[in-house]
Amino acid sequence: MTTQSRIKNEMKNMIENHSDEFFAYPSENDYLNWHFTIKGPKNTEFEGGIYHGILNLNNNYPSNQPTIQFFTPNGRFAVNTALCLYTLSNKGWQTNWTLINLLEALINYMPIQESHTGSITESKEKRLEYAKNSSQFKCEKCGLATEHIKGNVNF
């Protein structure tokens, strides 16, 4: 299966298997760049937060894992920095993983304190503040404003 046909299947899968915890969509100009929005994991200091970022796929996807960047401050991951997560690295990445699997893993990984490229450690209070303020975020790249999706019944 080519990268392009795999990505088309991913788009269909994302629509058919709607989640209340996240959504993602390809950029209008580049099907290899997917903007994502996730809810902070429940029962953590991220709960109530809405976090936006980008998954950069490549021409070898799914053989190579996408890179992940957050745009919304969250106190766990640096913004505008490619993350290198060991559990999501090529050692753990498998070609049968979908973008849905990746986003679910990312949500589950948020509260885990491990040091890696792109990680930061802010206090619980600061993370709670980021979660509260995340509703004011607007993506400069795609124009998505989290205030418009916070009450959306589909998310």
Question: For the regions a protein language model found, what residue spans apply to each?
Answer:
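Short, cysteine-centered beta-strand-loop-beta hairpins and adjacent loop/turn segments enriched
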Residues: 41-48, 60
